[in-house]
Amino acid sequence: MFNASVIKGLKTALFTAILFSASHASADIVISGTRIVYPESSKDIIVNLDNRGAKPLLVQSWLDDGRDEKSPEELKLPFVITPPVSRIDPKQGQSLRITYMGHSLPKDRESLFWFNVLEIPPKPKNANAENTNQLQLAFRTRIKFFFRPDGLKGSALEAADHVTWTMKKDGNGVSLVAHNESPYNVAISMVKLKSGQKTYEVAHQSVLPFSEKAMLVKGLTTTTTGKVAYETINDNGGVDNHETTLK
């Protein structure tokens, strides 16, 4: 079972425990969805966590703005998560309420944050103050969290479909440049350049609102013409396919 020392030390454990992302090890806590969208007009939103494991877990949830080395107290983001710390028994769930506090965020574009869940197993029953040489692993899951202001033009799906692509060559090699002229984040999960009879893999990256991102084309040494096929991840976590002509 959990004791007071475990709860008291959770904030320290957040940055001193050995952390494993969900992509490298199997976490027992499952988040409802692979991304979260918070519409500005919503008073709050609910995120559900499920413990798929066989042991009770102590769970802390927080948001960061990309600086994941900072503690939640240092970041001071305009959101409150209730409860921030909870115990979830095996095969049980916990609903978290996320509330926007109305502090100033850009009104003309989405803001990108990250939702974090840290799960810490209980101390073994035979653990005591004199016997602390036991390794406990803390697992962290981290997914994208989008704050979406009201009244943005177009839609997230239209933004993904209307990305334009150009090509440039510099000291790093030949790159495709994705231009996002929309107020939405475009999460790109795959890019390929089709030129003549050849298809080139591209090091894909997501593109922030009103910005551009250069992506290195593997195996290409000079600029060319052709078509760009790319995949984006939508609000529901599904994949949408797109193809357009290189400009």
What are these regions (language model features)?
Residues 49-53, 176-182:
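Asparagine-centered strand-capping/turn motif at beta-strand->loop junctions
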Residues 27-50, 155-170, 204:
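Beta-sheet-dominated interaction scaffolds and their linkers
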